[in-house]
Structures are given as C-alpha cells and as structure tokens.
Amino acid sequence: MARRSVFTLLALAMSAAAAAACADQPTAPATVASALRDRQAPPDPAEIRHVRQLAAQHGIGPLPAAPHVSEPLARLGQALMFDRILSGNRDMACSTCHLPEYGTSDGRSLPIGADGIGFGPSRMLGQGSVIPRNSPAVLDIASLRHMFLDGRVEVDANGRFHTPAGAQLTPAMTRVLQFGALSAQPMFPPTSTAEMRGHPAPGNELARIPDDSLDAIWAAIMKRLMAIPQYRAMFRAAYPGTPLTQLTFAHASNAIAGFIATRFHFANSPWDRFLAGDDRALTQQQLDGAQTFLTIKCVQCHNGPTLSDDQFHNVAVAQIGPGEGNGPSLHDDFGRMNVTGDPADLYRFRTSPLRNVELTAPYGHDGAIISLRAFIEHYSQSDQQLLNYDPSQLPAELQGTVLDNQAAILANRDTVIVGVVLTPDVVDKLMAYMQALTDPAARNLSSAIPRRVPSGLPVDRP
C-alpha cells in the first residue's frame, strides 16, 4: 500500500507539472515533497494554540507595516546605496558591505573597508583595513531603535537622536529623518576612514578633512552629489519644495533608509503565515522548534515582532579580528561600554533580529561563528563553547587573531544563558524554526540592484 501511494503521488506530481507547462501563467513546479506536504495532516491543534499563545505573551506578532515611502525617495535611496560616489576614493558603496546576494550582509566574518578590492567573501585587503565588527544585515530593521551592534545611533523613547555626531547632527537635520534610527545610520560609515572615507589619495578630498569634522565631511559628499545633474533632479523629485541649497547629507541618508525600509521589508515567512492563522504553514518539526524556542531562554532576548529585544547582551562570543582598540592588547572590543561608559555594558552587543537569519551568515558581533547551526549550538553550555572555541572554522587570515580574553568575557556574560543545554534533537528543531523565519522573497534580492547609478561608477553585482 505504501509503495502504491508513492507511485500515486508521483503520478499526481507529474500531472501537475505537465499542466503547469501548458498553462498561460507560470506555476511553481510540483514535486513529490510538495504532494506529500499537501497530504500531510496539520500539526496537533493543541500545540498550535499553545505556540500562538506563547508568541502573544512575548509580543511576537506580525512585523509593523513598512512605512510609506514615495517612489522618488525610494529611487534616490536605491541609487545612493549602490553608488560608490559616497566613498572617499570612489571605490566602494554602502552595498559593498550590504550585498543583496548575501542577505544584505557580505558573507564575511569581518568586512574589508575602504581601499579593498572586490566584494563578498572573495574581497581582498588591497590597501584597506579589516573592520572590527561583522556587517549586520539590514533586513526588517526599520522598527529598531538602536543601530550598529553597539547601539551608538539611537532614538530614545522621547524621539531624541543620540549619535556620535553630537551637536553636529543639527535639529534641522533630525527633522528630515523620517524613519527613526534607521534614517541616521547611513550618515556614519562614509565618515569613517576605515569603512568608506579612505586614506589620502588624489581625488579624495574627504580624507583631508579632520576626523571629527563630520559636518564638513557630509557637506563635501553633498557637493559631489550636487555636481551630478541626475542627482540634482532626483533630489528635487524626492524632496519637492526644498531648495537644493538647503539639502544636507541627512536628506541623502534618509533616502537610503526609505529604500531599505521598503525594499528589504519581508513579512510572508511561514512563521508570519502561521501567526496569521494558517495551521499548515509550519511543519511539525518547525512547530516543535517554535514551541521549544518560546519555552526555553531564547525568547528572553529574542522577542517582539523582529525577534529582538533591541537591547544589549554578552553571550560569550569569542573575540577575533583587530578589535576596537580596547584593552591592554588594543585588539579587544568592549561593545556597548564604548558608547555608555558603563562597566555593566562590557562585551554587550545588540540582540540580532532573527527574521531571515539563515540568509545572513556568519554570526556574532565579529562573525566568529560561521554557520547558523553552530551559532545555535553555541548557546548550549556557552561558557565551555567559548573556552573550546575552534578557530579553524575561520578564514585563514583570521585564525590567528582569537584574543585570550575569555575570563574577562565570562566575568560579565549574561546569566540568562547559564545552564542552557541543547540536545542534537533540540538543535534540529530550533534550526527548523529558524528556517521558518525566512520569507521566500528574501532568497533572491538581485532585483534590488540598479543597472547603473548616476555617477556612472561601477555597481557591485554578482
């Protein structure tokens, strides 16, 4: 009987595929797997109800709707995100570290900034520098109040901006920033020598400006943009009624944020469909994984619609790479403490959102953990995981950079992760749940890449 059922399903699948081939509209190809899934009974109704109740208790619901962004503003933001004109030596764009083909990260443990060569995992150092922290994905981040892994760009509960620019980010600028902290975030990488501004070279007027004169750097970038007729037209369309002479780099940054907030907003994962009432959206293993996630300590930090509390935690990740110039070695990274000055924030970093997380490897504030499964396993007896960290998983050039600061990390690591033990079966279930957080539309973002940009400079593309 079982063999006959399989042949019946094969026949159904082949018939569906043939019908699709003859149809006027393309149809997703039928497979034995999809036929079996269609015949599969839904998971246990009691478990379905329980998981939905647990999710509601932790504020885990649908993502907030994407903000309204005018088409001219989104087009301007797209052009700016992919245009190398924002970098000092015109050799990299925002997208060089936030590549659509790598889930809007770059596929590297640690990025290579200005004056590097190429993009993605094969990017070479050239005359550039290794950036101390992993390039965070920008998928579904518009609702977060803290940007960057240390939260140095923040909008507080009263709507006030707190950034490294201090008073240089003027009230007139902040009034332009429509999309919260996300609107301010793109203002800062172009001011960093290591990230985008680069070192002095012919044609790099940005590098000659003092490091702390952010307002002068922003003005110089706008001078570049306003020298390009197409950008002048695009800014006029995006900000009708604003004279070109009153535009600041806040207008450019806000446009990039508007593009990110709409183009990289994904709310149709199996998990979203489950929350919306589709009892068949999750497989039994994914449902079991969701229940596990919601009943063990994961949910204490990964909660809310983005599955991030938007707060800061020390989860005992090994320190690799050049670091932020902290500690006796100058290769340490004190995390949130670098922003607040509070010793309680030592080695704390922002909780990463988990939507589409399987697309954004590597993981950890410094990309020290290469695979998603390994990152889940890291939370099982995390103290031992740190002490037994295996650098062979890293690219060869980073394997010798693991810092011997494990005792200091463990002295301040969050107690919430103490005592967590995950069996291989539990890891399998959690992994299945993580995959249920992926919107199929996020798997191929090639259409986000423009064919050309107004500067005429090359565009990073696969």
Language-model segment annotations:
Residues 6, 21-462:
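Periplasmic c-type cytochrome electron-transfer domains
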